[in-house]
Each structure stands twice: as C-alpha cells, then as structure tokens.
Amino acid sequence: LAREVQAQLSGPGLAEFLRRMYGNHPDLWDAGLQGADRLRIIVNALTRLRFCTPEGRMDFDSTESAAQAPEGLVPWFDAPGRRTRGTLIAFGHWSTLGWISRPDILGLDTGCVWGGALSAVRFGATLAEREHCKVQCPQAQRPGE
C-alpha cells in the first residue's frame, strides 16, 4: 500500500495527488477502493490513524493517549481481528501514547517536540533483547508556546 502512495509522490501526478489527498473520508478500508479515495485512506491510515471503532472505522479527530480512548473507540493496534497482529509494527506520531513495546507493536514517539525524549530502539532476537535508547530534548517547544 505504501508503494502506491510512493509512486504518486515521485510521479508526474504529484500536484494533483496533493490537491486530492486531504480529508477524513473514506474512513473504512475496502480493498475495492480506487483512485483518490484509495490513496487518501492509505495516507490517513499510515500517518494519522490513532483510534478506530471495533469494526475498523477510522477516527481522525481524537489525539488522546490510548488510556484515554474516547467512548466507542480503541487504539488501532488493539482493534479486534487486526490482520497484522502477528507482525511487528514500529510506529510514531502519537506522543501522548509514549513508549510502548509489545511483541506486535513498538510505539517510538516519546514527545521530543514537546520536551520529552527522542527515542530509538536496537532490535535483538527476542522482545527481552530490545534496547530502548533515548536522548532528552530540553530545547523543545512546550505545548501552547
């Protein structure tokens, strides 16, 4: 799916792609989606998605931490029936979630921009061998500044 977007970003139709990329719909994946709708949902799922309904409908308004999930929503990685549950997915862009390390997910955003830390991970053969490396970001902007 990412390759479909990559082809648009590096192709001659970039300007048209960017004009049509923004929006919150569609918000439910369907393999039959085509054109701008298909590209938009791929971009949104890969860059903006935090919560969804248990049925998989994506929510693009909520930014709370997973512990403060709005009623009726679950973090995308805890959605029932998630097909990638057996695959490790490393992700960021959710600073209110913070560091999270499970066999199937690795949340790396520890809020550097907001005065937290810049995180990286060194992978080992097992979950116990994952090494979390972080550097504080004291020069960062605080929310609301």
Label each residue range with its predicted role.
Residues 1-145:
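Feature recognizes metal-dependent phosphohydrolase scaffolds
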